[in-house]
Amino acid sequence: STDSTQAEETTETADTSAAEETAQVSSDEPCEIYMFISSPEYADAIGELIDAYKEVAPNVTINYETTQNDYPTLLKAKLNSGEVPDIFSSTSGKEIDVYKEYSYDLAGQPLTETMSDAVAATMQSPADGSGCYGIAIKGNYFGIVYNKAIFEECGITEFPSTVSAMKDACEKISAAGYKPFTTGFNEWWVYKHVAQHFFDAAAANAGISAAELVSGFENGTAKISDYPELYNNFFDFIDLAVKYGDDKPLETALDGEESAFGTGKAAMVLGQGAWIEADVLSIDPDIQIGFNGYPVTEDASQCQVISGSDQSLHVNKDSAVLQQTLDFMNWWYTSDYGKAWFTDVAGVVPPIKSDVQSNFEIIKQGDELAASAGAADLEIIYSTDSWHQTFGEIMQSYIAGDLDKDGACAQIEKQWQEIDGAQ
């Protein structure tokens, strides 16, 4: 089986890699590392990674547990009871500071030599720009995933990169009998992925950074209505997606999106990125996938993909098996197997400096677009997931008709200040 072949290859490279030798030396005593993280979509790939590490450090047992629902709540319960996992996860950016008191500073570790600059920037403390308080399972690309064949059939020759071009495209796609969008509006995190493109444009057009804009909302000085990119364009885009999207938008979750897109019913997928490609290809291996940014204004140059890492894996600074945990993390980022794992096993955007070409269209096109048109800021990392979840719930109330636009804006401003302003 592939597993055993990979394990054999790992055993061979173990003899030649200095990082792996170090791991073996310091792991002679049997020990257990407790790894409790989110991102269950990578459970199989991480299982393979752990199996491969067992070949290198046979005395180390990694007890791996993962969950998506309520992860922040479950983690906080563990931290409060003094059961800090040896490896735990959070979002990057603002939550680096939230969990900093529990996190080992990885600056100076071998893994920082291979970590990509974009990822390293999201692992620093935003408060003072210091340190490296985590590693990423993946870099990422966020944008609109679309079906090139449907676009072609509808006579849309280039991606609609302005607000008005997108409205025209939706009319054409709808007239041809397809759903222009599948939205996933049942998932709270879809809204943060869509909205960040509009927040980036709002910040850029106001001559400030996305981080400065977020801090304005946190301290109550910013208003949605001050920014047409948010008050007009973001809400108009949500309205457009509801009009031209799933029959029951608030009941459509990630699997519904993948199904609607993979079976050729919907032309564009909202709120997703590189992580859906494998599932979509398992539905239709021949689908022609396209990828681009969100049309946020009438300036086509502001339609950019977003790149970076929105998740961080922390090492417990007071771990009883600190050295063994560091050995594992360094091996993951520096060994031949570990470096190849990102593309070959997990199928993700590597968070490390890598010349390896991905087989995934979203990653290939993301690389090309980021190089040619630049990538916008990963705005979501400046807020906590506690806030993002509330934001998603407010937008769901807006779509359900329980809040009008001004009511939604008032809630966004009030809750943002209450949840993240206090942190």
Task: Kindly label every feature range from the protein language model.
Residues F36, D51, A77, E95, ...:
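Extracytoplasmic/periplasmic substrate-binding proteins
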Residues Y99-E101, A121-F159, F185-E218, Q302, ...:
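Periplasmic solute-binding protein
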Residues D28-P40, V60-E65, I87, Y133, ...:
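Short, well-ordered beta-strand elements
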